[in-house]
Every structure is written in structure tokens, then in C-alpha cells.
């Protein structure tokens, strides 16, 4: 305790380094690989079907009519993506490329491929073990499937997850995101952070005070719009600079397994940063997304789990790939070699987009960053509230929302190095109990999957 009081930053640096060390990364990827094997590559064989479940309108696809839940499959996916697609898609990918090299993009893809199985497993358990609260709303997520699926003896682990999730929401969910918006607005428009903070706080309060339905409604509009805007902007840059595309893709694959990296021991760095940033971006295994999945109207846990699985695909395989490929294209030297930049994070992404598309390239990143961060604030409010209510009770919900909205304002005017470190630590601590639960309940996930396929075959459920 004294170490923490004397130097809290050093304390969290040490703890975060341990939490997100090789063991955690192996556990995250290993869980995904195990579920992929047990589910016979479901993320490959059923991806098309899963995307259809997510995006076909309810009036044409009746899976959500007359079933328990608060919001549609699509709204649940957009709520999860609102929290998932954030500054990590812009700043996180840039950090991975600078620190781990172009090959880190390849390992980010690998993390997403196996992470889809993890996200699927989370979704199955979230819907299967969800409960109705006193307001008639659905509540679910790791804290519920740990307690109900593993038994009362595991209640301590459920409480630990929920407590860590509550703390994490005030950092990575609100303060860090609002700080990113304030900096971006000040850089691009010269507006003081305090004014941005007031505006962002009001916009957040208006939405989150309406609960999950308000958040889902906002997310269902913001997320598709911002994702399409950013992806189209990135694709335009790739098309305009198409001569650099193949050299960049070739470099991504060659650097992932380069003899030089293997011989020098750098291959571990390439893999570590690719895996770590991929996990931070798509949150597969962290246990956050299943909290939103539990609110979906569905006739079977597997149907919503398939929709949840597409979130990892859209976040990393689509959005992060755009950032990664444009960055590598922009950092190619005259001889096709990778030129390590002097800047990193969101600044590097902004500079590179501007270089590749003069005039508006930087604006694509700035506008994308603003909306990505704002949507993350909305999504994480729901996650944090559900965690807080599990620990402290339903009466705490109103107090939590007030505190969360206040942290949005604080984030725009404070230095957040410590908050970043603390949030990273709590996110990792969330993942540990969740991954343990997934491994212990892998058989449940497999059995539910078999049951769904059988009912589809027998005509008991709509296809």
C-alpha cells in the first residue's frame, strides 16, 4: 500500500506489465484457439450467416419478435461496437506498428480470427444465464454466467469481475476518451478543452440518462455512420495510392515471420504488440461485449452469439486493417523498406493520412477519432453501470450515471497518464475471471451450439 501511495504511476506500471504479460496474452489467444477447435471453426463456416443475422431488418427476419430482451440483435451489436470501436482503432494500431513493426498488423489479424470464437462463447453464456432485474430489464455478462453457471462458490470471482469493470469504466470508458476528443478538437479547431468538456458532458448525459434503450438508439445511428465514413476515407486513400498497396501487404506478411526478427529475438515483440493491440481494440475475452449481448431479443443464445462474433470481425478485420494498411503504405521507403517514424499514436495516423491524401486526410482521422471516442463513452457507461449494480445493488444505478457523466468532464481537463495505466490494469483484471469461466464452461458453449443447429435442422427455429 505504501508503494502505491508514494508513486501510484510506478505501481500501476508494474502491475499492468504483469497483468498484460506473456501469460495473459497466451491465455487470451489460447482460449480462442481452444474454442475454435471445439466449435470446428464456426467463425469461418458461419460468418456469412452471422452477418445476415446482424444486418437483415427485423421485419424480414423474425428472430427477435416476441422474445425476451430489451433491444434488437442489431442494436445490441451496435452498442457493443460503440464501446469497442474507439481510439484504439486509430492510436492503438499506430502504436503497434511503430513498436512491433509492420508484422504486428498480421498478428492483430490472427488475434481477431481466434478472438471471434472467444466473443461467440461470451455471447452464448451471456444470453443463457441472463436475468430480469427489478425494472424488467435484462442483465447479463460474465458476473452472471460465473455465478449461475459455475455456482455460488464462484461468487467471489463474479464480484471481482464486476468491481474491476466498474473501475475500468471511469478510465478507459470515459476520462481517457473525453481527453482524446478534447485534444483532437483543440488541435484541429483551436477550441479550449473546457468548452469541449461541457459540450461532451451534456451530450453524454442526454443519452445515458435514458438507459440501454437510449444508448442503443444513439449507437445504432452513430456507429454505422462513423464506421462507413472512416472505412470509405481509408479505402479512398488506398485506391489513390494503389501502387504502394501490394508492397505494403507483402511487408506486413514478410515482417511477421522475418528471419531477421526471429534471429534477433524481435519476433516476440512483433507478436506481443500485435496481439496486445488487437485485444485492446476488439475486446474479445475481456468480458465487456457480452454485457450488451445479454440485452438482445433472441430465441436462442447462439443466434445472438453469432451476431456478437461479427463485432470482432468488423472492428479488427475491417476498421483496424484500414488503419494498419494505410500506415504501412505511408511509411514505406524508396526501396520498399519500412521507415520507422518519429511520432506514434493518433498523431502518426493523422500525419500519415494527411500525407497520403493532402487536404482532407487529417480530417478523416480527426472526425473519426471524435465520434469513435464519443461512442465508446456511451457504450462503456452501460457496461460500467451493469457491473456497479451487480456489486452495489439497483439503487446505485442513478449515482453511478451521475459519477460517470462527471468523469467525462474531468477527463477533458486532467492529465491522464495515471488513468491510462490504471484502466489498462483493470481491463486486464476483468479478462482473467472471464477467461477462466470460458474455459470451465466450454462444454456448455459446445452443447448450446449443437442444440441450435439441431433445432434449425428440425424446423423448430427459423433459419
Residue ranges of predicted features:
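Membrane-interface loop-to-helix entry segments
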Residues: 27-34, 38-51, 161, 178-185, ...
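Alpha-helical membrane segments and immediately flanking helix-loop junctions
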Residues: 61-98, 125-143, 147-149, 160-163, ...
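Membrane-embedded translocation segments of transport machinery
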Residues: 217-220, 226-289, 294
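Flexible loop linkers connecting adjacent transmembrane helices
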Residues: 42-71, 95-105, 109, 117-152, ...
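N-terminal alpha-helical transmembrane segments of multi-pass membrane transport
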Residues: 1-83, 87, 97-104, 115, ...
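Extracellular/periplasmic helix-exit of transmembrane alpha-helices
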Residues: 120-129, 134, 233-251, 259, ...
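Helix-loop-helix module between adjacent transmembrane segments
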Residues: 35-36, 111-136, 143, 147-179, ...
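Transmembrane helix-loop junctions in multi-pass membrane proteins
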Residues: 7-8, 38-43, 88-93, 169-182, ...
